[in-house]
Amino acid sequence: MARIKVHELRQKTKAELLNQLKDLKAELALLRVAKVTGGAPNKLSKIKVVRLSIAQVLTVISQKQKLALREAYKNKKFLPLDLRPKKTRAIRRRLTKHQQSLKTEREKKKEMYFPMRKYAIKV
């Protein structure tokens, strides 16, 4: 089997991808049997290509699933943890911009009664 092009995989449906994955795994099993029984060298070198193809198919499947989940949770209030932006732990714990801008009643009154003084410079 020749190497698979990923852009072709992206065009396929999930059922087609799962069928292809099953075929590739079956082929890999045959190649491993050939390796144990002392098969031809060209079959041994094919193992690497088939394993790569399996990885590519699995990657495309998982990417499609994640994309579908993102669409499903698009306008929801809460997101599953794996769909949230990674960031660092410290950044995730920080206050939001809104929380930082909030002021107590006392602060509001103080600013209202004692505003910043404005000075005009005579030239």
From Swiss-Prot:
* GO process annotations (BP): maturation of LSU-rRNA from tricistronic rRNA transcript (SSU-rRNA, 5.8S rRNA, LSU-rRNA); translation
Show the Pfam families listed in the entry.
Ribosomal_L29
Please give the CDD domains that the UniProt record associates with this protein: Ribosomal_L29_HIP (cd00427)
Any keyword Nucleotide-binding? no
A single GO cellular-component term from the record reads:
cytosolic large ribosomal subunit
**Could you tell me which cysteines form disulfide bridges?**
none
What UniProt keywords are attached to this protein's entry?
Ribonucleoprotein, Ribosomal protein
Molecular function (GO) terms listed? mRNA binding; structural constituent of ribosome
Keyword Chaperone attached: no
**Name the record gives this protein:** Large ribosomal subunit protein uL29
Q: Which family does the similarity line name? A: Belongs to the universal ribosomal protein uL29 family.
